[in-house]
Amino acid sequence: MDKIITAIFKVESEGYQALTELKQNPETDKYVVSQAVLIKKENNGLNTLDSFDTGIETSNDTLAGGLIGGLVGILGGPIGMLLGGSLGALTGSVFDLGDALDNESIIEKVSDMIMDGEVCMIALAQEKEPGQLQQKLSKFNVSIVESNAAEVEEEIEQAIKAEKELEKEARAKLREAQKEDLKNKVEEKKQQLQAGIEEVKAKVNKD
């Protein structure tokens, strides 16, 4: 079974070390790592630090194709930032992410766990026995989330739909705000014109 292993490191150098060790020895008698990427959360965005692709086939190579890239894209996009609390202005949105993502989803877990300045390694792997990669990474100060790769693919599809809904709502709110702003400006101009007319009338009556 293909798995997505997400490891969040408190110390950046440990993240680099973990990725390097897997890159140097991606296939053992305990596990096989096909792809991995190291990202860092900075200024509420995600930057890719390093990555590798061994070319080793997974049990579902079609599924594996853009899986890690898709997950990174979601985590660094509006949904990931909203779940991680980076889009404070939208947290009161009427759009309920709970309708789109399960509370136990990897997207929600990782978005909530990774803090600004921390690094995260995401790996696509197969294990001969459960917990083999966790055991290897346990020497680091790390928090690990494991998910079935097929389930992650489904989560990504749901998150993409949620992003589209969020974008539609944001556009609608922006248009409404622009209409309200225009209405206020028109009303302000009317008041200014009326004040000017009253001023002229007052001068005429005085003369």
For each predicted feature, which ranges?
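Membrane-engaging insertion elements
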Residues: 86-124
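Conserved, surface-exposed functional patches that form binding/active-site neighborhoods
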Residues: 111, 126, 132-135
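Terminal export/targeting leaders at protein ends
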Residues: 1-35, 130-131, 138, 149, ...
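Short, low-complexity, glycine-enriched hydrophobic/amphipathic alpha-helices that associate
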Residues: 55-101
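Short beta-strand segments
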Residues: 8-9, 123-125
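Short flexible coil/turn linkers enriched for glycine and charged/polar residues
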Residues: 42, 115-117, 139
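Terminal membrane-proximal soluble interaction domains of membrane-associated proteins
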Residues: 124, 137-151
